[in-house]
Amino acid sequence: MFAGLQDLGVANGEDLKETLTNCTEPLKAIEQFQTENGVLLPSLQSALPFLDLHGTPRLEFHQSVFDELRDKLLERVSAIASEGKAEERYKKLEELLEKSFSLVKMPSLQPVVMCVMKHLPKVPEKKLKLVMADKELYRACAVEVKRQIWQDNQALFGDEVSPLLKQYIVEKENALFSPELSVLHNFFSPSPKTRRQGEVVQKLTRMVGRNVKLYDMVLQFLRTLFLRTRNVHYCTLRAELLMSLHDLDVGDICSVDPCHKFTWCLDACIRERFVDGKRARELQGFLDGVKKGQEQVLGDLSMILCDPFAINTLSLSTVRHLQELVGQEMLPRESPDLLLLLRLLALGQGAWDMIDSQVFKEPKMEVELVTRFLPTLMSFVVDDHTFNVDQKLPAEEKAPVTYPSTLPESFTKFLQEQRMACEVGLYYVLHITKQRNKNALLRLLPGLVETFGDLAFSDIFLHLLTGNLALLADEFALEDFCSSLFDGFLLTASPRKENVQRHVLRLLIHLHQRVAPSKLEALQKALEPTGQVEEGEGAHQVPGPVLGEAPSHVCVTPW
């Protein structure tokens, strides 16, 4: 432990042992050893007899002096690191490191050596290897030193990052299955800035620092994991990490990430939960500005747009825009703003396919989505307005009007075959549920049994739907409503999808008192586990080996 002292010409325990072994007068030898190796300052030496009279052990005295000197030395090292020209101060620190590194394994002096290394932008490679080879030293060194180790050792960096990524995914999935059922406090309620203060994002930000190479490694981990698991929460983390570095004004990274300004603009939209005309044009400008030969940037842009918070904002804006078009008596194809929202939505939803195929082209917009599906959706809005107006008429003027109960066959076909149509359709369902529009909900529920990629049974949609259904609490006392919701929709996926059962249970925990006892008993029986369960969509794990794979290159280009 004290071997390093000999290199500095300082006596240690072995020297004392040898002295006592060879001496003829041990007491004199001890006194001489104390004199030679004790505190040499006259002002302190004179205090020793006084302390002896008070029974203060010499060890306690020397330890106190040592601690004080070490603190002063740490302060001085930090001062050297911030004074004068860079070249001069780094030279001083390198000299100090050379003299002190032999003491790095001494617990009492280790903080000084670590402090010196922390302030060096480039620690000598030989010393980095010695630190990396010793687990105790590696754990003790500052993150500034670890960055220098990680940038040339992706496997080790992957080992550090992997638990954080697993933790992040678990936190997101736990939020989706939160026992709280509320329209005001749901998965999308926290603001972007609040989310970026989360433990995982802050730790990753600290680990990356201003190191472009490490930032690029994290992006490669996220892309690979997204490709392997299809878990969209990795897309969220990709955007949050970039904006966390933006908050800290880390220009070294933000200035070289081609997605920075696009993500910054989109972040403002997510904060407002709406894409206004001005920001829509800014986003369009970024997409149109992708030059020939730089199409790979679309890969990262699509991943950022695949973030559930971005999809949520774009979908809400689309539904709101459709309602405005009804009032303006305009068709979807006549609205450039709506077409841009659809373009962004299509790019986000096509992220996985783009990364998988490595074909970096914007997905082609289905013409029928704009010319047939969206007008049909607008006709549903008109049906609601017509029915509501009729209900408000005086009895003598009211015509016998019944609310439409069927869906056009083409509409359900769109939900089954086109992802874009399905996403917009599901957000329209969320909209009418939030408006407490029971008639419209019951009309649309049968169309949700079979949707593109079972999107109607995804955790995000069911999380939002169950929260909105809390507004219709009184309707759960009605047999027809419960049958349509549970038997006609939710239970059609049970027990095939375990996640659906969990969301149904979340709903019943809050509303079971409103449900008729006979119906509640039937639901309990239907929800009993059978042992034949698929993995929920939130069951994805972070594959360990992925983070240890060497990248094909290391630079801040999207791919």
Task: Report the location of each language-model feature.
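Very long, low-complexity or repeat-rich scaffold/adaptor subunits
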Residues: 1-559
